[in-house]
Amino acid sequence: MVKQVSDSSEFKSIVCQDKLVVVDFFATWCGPCKAIAPKFEQFSNTYSDATFIKVDVDQLSEIAAEAGVHAMPSFFLYKNGEKIEEIVGANPAKLEASIKANL
């Protein structure tokens, strides 16, 4: 299951968990973001040991800016509040490989 984050404090509390957190930074107007969304949802079901969240960069621009997001979609992997990997672009194979490698 993918949870859409609603504010900065929620984002920080989730990414500080002692497990893999996969963040999808997206925009509603972004075609590639829409194209990969079903795969991201599928990964959340397949890799249930990780937490999957989405951040709308237009609604939560301060989170995106603080994280260093420059293009959408961007997928950041966190553990214990530290960003451990970054995938830019709608590349499901690369995203899945990164999830597997960091679980």
Curated annotation (Swiss-Prot):
Membrane spanning residue stretches: none
Purpose of the protein: Participates in various redox reactions through the reversible oxidation of its active center dithiol to a disulfide and catalyzes dithiol-disulfide exchange reactions.
By its UniProt entry, which NCBIfam families does this protein fall under? thioredoxin
What protein is this chain from? Answer: Thioredoxin-1
Q: Which residues form the Thioredoxin domain?
A: 2-103
Question: What is the originating organism of this protein?
Answer: Schizosaccharomyces pombe (strain 972 / ATCC 24843)
The cross-references to Pfam families, in alphabetical order and at most eight, read: Thioredoxin
Q: List, from the UniProt record, the residues annotated as the active site of this protein.
A: 30, 33
Cite the position(s) of the site with description Deprotonates C-terminal active site Cys: 24
User: Which cysteine residues pair off into disulfide bonds?
Assistant: 30-33
Write down the InterPro entries for this protein, in alphabetical order: Thioredoxin, Thioredoxin-like_sf, Thioredoxin_CS, Thioredoxin_domain
Sorted alphabetically, the keyword list is: Disulfide bond, Electron transport, Redox-active center, Transport
Protein's gene: trx1
Give the positions of the site Contributes to redox potential value: 31-32
Assigned protein family: Belongs to the thioredoxin family.
User: What one GO molecular function would you report for this record?
Assistant: antioxidant activity
Gene Ontology CC? cytoplasm; cytosol; nucleus
What does the entry give for GO biological process? cell redox homeostasis; cellular detoxification of hydrogen peroxide; cellular response to reactive oxygen species; hydrogen peroxide catabolic process; L-methionine salvage from methionine sulphoxide; sulfate assimilation, phosphoadenylyl sulfate reduction by phosphoadenylyl-sulfate reductase (thioredoxin)
| PROSITE patterns hit by this protein | THIOREDOXIN_1, THIOREDOXIN_2
